[in-house]
Curated annotation (Swiss-Prot):
This is Polyadenylation factor subunit 2. SMART domains: WD40 (SM00320). Required for 3'-end cleavage and polyadenylation of pre-mRNAs. Also involved in chromosome segregation where it has a role in chromosome attachment to the mitotic spindle. Keywords: Chromosome partition, mRNA processing, Nucleus, Repeat, WD repeat. It comes from Aspergillus fumigatus (strain ATCC MYA-4609 / CBS 101355 / FGSC A1100 / Af293) (Neosartorya fumigata). CDD domains: WD40. One of its GO terms (cellular component) is chromatin. The lineage of its organism: Eukaryota, Fungi, Dikarya, Ascomycota, Pezizomycotina. GO terms for biological process: chromosome segregation; co-transcriptional mRNA 3'-end processing, cleavage and polyadenylation pathway. WD repeats lie at residues 26-65, 91-130, 133-172, 175-215, 218-258, 288-327. It is found in: Nucleus. It comes from the Eukaryota.
């Protein structure tokens, strides 16, 4: 299938009608935000209890989780490896509901339940400007992708535009009749702004006319989330409090039968006074979630839509394959009872699928894709997480290193499992002719996962030697074993080669 960019004039082919995958975090709490990373390799989700979870964007498997709960009004900076590098304490006096970056990425805008918006300098970590004017909680904000223009939506039903240089409110829109839940500028057509509200409608505004040109109807419950497609400027997706997911095409009204069509303001001789055109969904996924959809976000390539919900699930949606129509009978379109009656879904299969997902999550954790604790200890330079197999390493302690005091790992492919034998007497004779006080080239019993074998041992299996017999042979030839420090002791005192022994015990954490 071609990517959406290859069919730029056919947005209908990009509508994500098919359920692709679902994921649930280990805390099993509501998902309040979902965001793809800029390159689209991972998806970051935020939980109701203050947890961030990272999901693989290809296999959709769980990677890691970080508990970031803190005080209301705090803003925290995080690195991609989940190191908390800075915290702006008391950035607001109440919960922060939304953030938006400036086009230059040097400043960001925050919206809070304390009725204010603030512009922060990212480097200085200080509030440059405070925007006041809303009379109730500010639920959403956005920064225009190319211009010095801000927008905010509030519980006072108002949409306000702001000048970031003067902190002055430029104008206020009163089109909505309930809380404004989302305000988003289009990244493709910078003249358009979309808003959603608890009045069960979404609206599209033209900034050149400073008025609404489209009203998106069809939802039976308040709209809680909205997103633009990153490539098609006419495709908008909305999520509702009843768990429904609707997709709208701004150039296709899709009116119900019997309803009189309305004309678009652009096609009217008097665009300023023509009522906004009413648009109905081009596609409905009525049972996308079983509770409120709090957040929606498109993959940067525009082929996968992620949704986060109060039902604790993060779900992924994609286009249907050419000729595929079976998705219309799945449980997300017709409901669980109807799907079960038609044989397209069974409750037993759903429970089994849940168990398999939980088992997969447990397996991911067992493979070192585990919780990252919020600690102040820094990782080793150049090593963001512990190398595989070193999760329990503690310098200077009696903890087991891989291959020391533990069973030998499985041999590499193409290598015999049996180790070559050597006569201890012959080895003692060889050692007696050499300087026994230089063990620096003495190879380890096994390679440490994540680190290459020493050059002298590349491709060569370690020797299987009876150390007790070797000690007897050395003593019989007058060689004192005390000159040979044990490998375990040398590792315990000097640490791993190339790493300082002063590494704190909590460097490697699970």
């Amino acid at each position: 299938m071609l990517p959406p960019l290859a069919r730029i004039h056919s947005p209908a082919d990009t509508i994500p009608v098919r359920h692709l995958h679902q994921s649930i975090g280990k805390s099993k709490k509501p998902i309040t935000v979902v965001r793809w990373t800029p390159e689209g390799r991972r998806l970051l989700t935020g939980g109701h209890t203050g947890e961030f979870m990272l999901w693989n964007g290809t296999a959709f498997n769980f990677e890691t989780v970080m508990d970031v709960r803190g005080q209301k009004g705090d803003i925290k900076y995080w690195r991609p490896n989940f190191n908390n590098v800075e915290t702006i304490d008391d950035a607001h006096h109440d919960a922060v509901r939304d953030l938006a970056w400036s086009p230059s990425d040097t400043k960001f805008l925050s919206a809070s339940d304390d009725t204010t918006l603030k512009i922060f300098d990212f480097t200085a970590r200080t509030a440059d400007t405070v925007l006041t004017g809303h009379n109730w909680d500010v639920k959403s904000c956005d920064w225009h992708p190319t211009k010095g223009l801000l927008v905010s939506g509030s519980k006072d039903h108002q949409v306000k535009f702001w000048d970031p240089r003067t902190a002055r409110c430029l104008t206020t829109l009163h089109s909505h009749k309930n809380t404004v839940t989302t305000t988003r500028f289009s990244r493709v057509n910078s003249n358009l702004l979309a808003t959603s509200s608890r009045d069960q409608t979404a609206r599209v505004f033209d900034l050149r006319m400073m008025r609404d040109i489209c009203i998106l109807r069809g939802h039976e419950k308040p709209i809680s989330s909205l997103t633009w497609h990153p490539i098609h400027s006419s495709l908008i997706s909305t999520g509702s409090e009843d768990g429904s997911l609707y997709h709208y095409l701004l150039d296709e009204p899709n009116l119900p039968s019997g309803q009189v069509p309305t004309i678009a303001p652009y096609d009217s001789p008097d665009p300023a006074n023509t009522p906004a055109q009413v648009i109905y969904p081009a596609h409905r996924i009525q049972y996308a979630h079983s509770a409120t959809i709090w957040s929606l976000d498109w993959h940067p390539l525009g082929h996968i839509l992620a949704s986060g919900s109060k039902d604790n699930f993060t779900r992924f949606w994609s286009r249907a394959r050419p000729g595929e129509t079976s998705y219309m009978k799945d449980r997300f379109h017709i409901g669980e009872e109807a799907a079960e009656a038609q044989g397209t879904w069974s409750r037993g299969f759903g429970r089994r699928q849940m168990r398999e997902e939980e088992e997969q999550e447990a397996q991911d954790e067992a493979e070192s894709l585990v919780d990252q604790k919020n600690t102040t200890a820094q990782s080793l330079p150049g090593i963001q997480i512990a190398p595989p197999g070193l999760g329990s390493l503690q310098t200077g302690s009696g903890s087991l290193l891989p291959g020391i005091g533990a069973p030998q790992p499985a041999p590499q492919a193409g290598m015999s499992a049996s180790m070559p034998q050597m006569d201890p007497g012959r080895l003692a004779a060889i050692l007696s002719q050499q300087n026994p006080s230089q063990p620096q080239n003495f190879p380890s019993a096994t390679g440490i996962p994540g680190f290459p074998m020493p050059p002298a041992m590349s491709g060569t299996p370690p020797l299987n030697i009876d150390l007790a017999e070797l000690q007897k042979q050395l003593l019989s030839q007058g060689i004192s074993p005390q000159n040979f420090a044990s490998l375990a002791a040398s590792l315990g005192s000097a640490g791993l080669p190339g790493l300082q022994s002063s590494t704190p015990d909590n460097t490697y954490r699970r």
